[in-house]
């Protein structure tokens, strides 16, 4: 494993998404992203670590109340729908995902059902769509009432801890 700093994670993930089958080769000062079977490449320079804020300790995921699998297709569809209707927010509520603008009662929204493992049907967890820029793939997702979620890539060694919005509620 190569430790390196990225100044703009969204830009880095967007750069990777330019390739359908990206291969990453980590050098001392940059990562070379290439497309399997082609001559296409992108050189992405690492950031100076002194300008990047890093956590001071490891994140410990508290007990989670809701679990589900987010397929690559579902993730892509939901983020595309959010972009199309200009929805900045996503709600996980009683087994469905909905993108909308929570500050506007008459905002357009897009929703789909999920197969969710939860002991309660009475919850509403809010995410900012801008925080869901993830490397393409399927994710095993755990959500805690302590306003944190854990997205673990089903096939790779990639995981994200994504904060929930303060309006999130479990058994409310």
Can you say where each PLM-predicted feature lies in the sequence?
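Short, well-ordered, aromatic-rich surface patches in folded extracellular/luminal domains
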Residues: 45-54, 58
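DNA polymerase processivity clamps
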Residues: 1-45, 61-172
């Amino acid at each position: 494993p190569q430790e390196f700093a990225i100044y703009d994670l969204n830009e880095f993930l967007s750069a990777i998404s330019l390739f359908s089958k990206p291969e990453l080769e980590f050098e001392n000062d940059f990562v070379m992203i290439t497309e399997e079977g082609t001559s296409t490449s992108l050189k992405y320079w690492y950031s100076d670590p002194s300008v990047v804020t890093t956590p001071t300790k490891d994140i410990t995921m508290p007990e989670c109340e809701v679990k589900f699998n987010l397929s690559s297709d579902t993730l892509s569809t939901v983020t595309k729908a959010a972009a199309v209707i200009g929805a900045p927010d996503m709600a996980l509520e009683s087994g469905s995902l909905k993108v909308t603008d929570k500050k506007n009662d008459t905002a357009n929204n897009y929703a789909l059902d999920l197969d969710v493992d939860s002991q309660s049907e009475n919850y509403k967890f809010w995410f900012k769509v801008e925080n869901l820029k993830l490397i393409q793939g399927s994710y095993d997702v755990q959500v805690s009432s302590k306003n944190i979620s854990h997205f673990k890539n089903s096939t790779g060694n990639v995981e994200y801890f994504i904060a929930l919005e303060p309006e999130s509620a479990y058994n409310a």
